[in-house]
């Protein structure tokens, strides 16, 4: 990102900003914004900018969220993590649910689906690793 002089912004819904922090660590001043929000709030907010995530698959939602944060921040690259948890959310290593990752620029997008999601520390670590892997592969 720095080498290509590109900027990046991030949206995440269940990881409490840890993905944004990890990306900011390597992107430095090329990191624009990190946005964290729950489904209901972000859906209403996005409508004000003519983005709609209603009636879409989770993969489509992650792409729309990446496009949204890219547009909102005027970044070169938008990245989104959209996690859906199932089961007891108080468990530290939930490992259940679904994670959807998307990265977009002006012309390309790439997604990744992982059959694991949660709010515990191990879950967040898995989300960070999947995020960094997708970003690295996208930038190749």
For each feature predicted by the language model, list its residue ranges:
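Short alpha-helical segments enriched in small residues
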Residues: 1-140
């Amino acid at each position: 990102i720095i080498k290509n002089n590109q900027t990046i912004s991030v949206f995440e819904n269940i990881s409490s900003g840890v993905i944004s922090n990890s990306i900011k660590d390597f992107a430095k001043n090329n990191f624009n914004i990190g946005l964290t929000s729950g489904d209901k709030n972000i859906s209403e907010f996005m409508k004000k900018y003519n983005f709609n995530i209603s009636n879409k698959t989770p993969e489509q939602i992650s792409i729309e969220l990446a496009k949204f944060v890219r547009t909102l921040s005027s970044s070169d690259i938008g990245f989104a993590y959209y996690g859906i948890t199932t089961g007891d959310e108080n468990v530290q290593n939930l490992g259940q649910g679904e994670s959807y990752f998307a990265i977009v620029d002006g012309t390309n997008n790439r997604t990744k689906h992982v059959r694991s999601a949660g709010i515990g520390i191990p879950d967040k670590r898995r989300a960070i690793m999947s995020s960094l892997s997708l970003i690295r592969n996208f930038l190749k």
